């Protein structure tokens, strides 16, 4: 029997970026799901610098009578995980659930996550069944999940699904972390004592397009590699050693062949020498790029700039105000 504290209030955190078409339905379905809980609840919508009317719709929802919606407006786009962290800093619940705004993960799954967390788990992840994504998105997700499992040793099936539940101590601990590159599911699992996963439905995206383009997925993979482990640096050292030994061996071989076969053979081997040279130069540039990625992240962390700036927070039945402090 787990000895976790009882859950008295649930907070649902939803980052929003240009989701004006899905937002009314999202609010309706999420509110209905939360009303079915036998606990207090709140919904936090975080506008991540949307250029459409998402922010206006959020503010209107917060100002309705008997609203449970808190709207947090960031001054520009900072990315999905930064927006979620901004929401975490304003929650008041004992259990915090994250949910995407595109309705591909049904809000109706929220009671199941709460019930599972009530069993004493610190983190409740989800695995999408019958994924309604493109082949490219599915393939990229499999690669990312495999990469995470290999580097962290945490065998969870679907790190890419943001429909997840976290107990408050996990959230508080994550808020004390100040690294710029934050991948919330992994960071939470680092601190979780008991974590589990449940299968959930996955629907097609009805409105708009995915906000994760090819380049954003590539950047995400770089983030995962460099923020999770220093193994690539060790592999780089190993690769450098192999190349150095190979280069020395090749040099000895070329000298022997030059002495055995004469200068004419050496002249005819110029192109091979250039090929070897370009191989070594390419390996050096790969290594320099990887080192630069790590150094750049160290530089960003040392500057300790805020990950986001909260422009306004609109609470239910209250007047909007501008925050002087930011995270």
Curated annotation (Swiss-Prot):
Pathway: Glycolipid biosynthesis; 4-amino-4-deoxy-alpha-L-arabinose undecaprenyl phosphate biosynthesis; 4-amino-4-deoxy-alpha-L-arabinose undecaprenyl phosphate from UDP-4-deoxy-4-formamido-beta-L-arabinose and undecaprenyl phosphate: step 1/2; Bacterial outer membrane biogenesis; lipopolysaccharide biosynthesis. It is found in: Cell inner membrane. The keyword Transmembrane applies. It comes from the Bacteria. Keywords: Antibiotic resistance, Cell inner membrane, Cell membrane, Glycosyltransferase, Lipid A biosynthesis, Lipid biosynthesis, Lipid metabolism, Lipopolysaccharide biosynthesis, Membrane, Transferase, Transmembrane, Transmembrane helix. GO terms for molecular function: phosphotransferase activity, for other substituted phosphate groups; undecaprenyl-phosphate 4-deoxy-4-formamido-L-arabinose transferase activity. CDD domains: DPM1_like_bac. Pfam families: Glycos_transf_2. NCBIfam families: PRK10714.1 (NF007986). Belongs to the glycosyltransferase 2 family. Catalyzes the transfer of 4-deoxy-4-formamido-L-arabinose from UDP to undecaprenyl phosphate. The modified arabinose is attached to lipid A and is required for resistance to polymyxin and cationic antimicrobial peptides. This is Undecaprenyl-phosphate 4-deoxy-4-formamido-L-arabinose transferase. The gene is arnC.
């Amino acid at each position: 029997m787990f000895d976790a504290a009882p859950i008295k209030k649930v907070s649902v955190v939803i980052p929003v970026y240009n989701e004006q078409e899905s937002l009314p339905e999202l609010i309706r379905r999420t509110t209905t799901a939360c009303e079915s809980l036998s606990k207090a609840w709140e919904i936090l919508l975080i506008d991540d610098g949307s250029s459409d009317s998402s922010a206006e719709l959020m503010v209107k929802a917060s100002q309705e009578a008997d609203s449970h919606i808190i709207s947090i407006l960031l001054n520009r786009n900072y990315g999905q995980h930064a927006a979620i962290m901004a929401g975490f800093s304003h929650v008041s619940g004992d259990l915090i659930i994250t949910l995407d705004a595109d309705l591909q993960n049904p809000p109706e799954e929220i009671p199941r996550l709460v019930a599972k967390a009530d069993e004493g788990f610190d983190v409740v992840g989800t695995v999408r069944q019958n994924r309604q994504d493109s082949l490219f998105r599915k393939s990229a997700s499999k690669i990312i999940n495999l990469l995470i499992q290999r580097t962290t040793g945490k065998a969870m099936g679907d790190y890419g699904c943001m429909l997840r539940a976290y107990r408050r101590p996990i959230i508080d601990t994550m808020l004390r972390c100040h690294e710029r590159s934050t991948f919330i599911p992994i960071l939470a699992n680092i601190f979780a004592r008991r974590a589990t996963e449940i299968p959930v439905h996955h629907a097609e995206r009805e409105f708009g397009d995915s906000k994760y383009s090819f380049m954003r997925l590539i950047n995400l993979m770089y983030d995962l590699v460099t923020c999770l482990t220093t193994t690539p640096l060790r592999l780089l050292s190993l690769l450098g050693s192999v190349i150095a030994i190979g280069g020395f061996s090749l040099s000895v071989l070329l000298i022997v062949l030059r002495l055995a076969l004469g200068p004419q053979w050496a002249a005819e081997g110029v192109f091979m020498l250039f090929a070897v040279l370009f191989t070594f130069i390419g390996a050096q540039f790969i290594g320099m790029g990887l080192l630069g990625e790590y150094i750049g992240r160290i530089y960003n962390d040392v500057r300790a700039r805020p990950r986001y700036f909260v422009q306004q927070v609109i609470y239910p039945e209250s007047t909007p105000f501008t925050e002087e402090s930011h995270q």
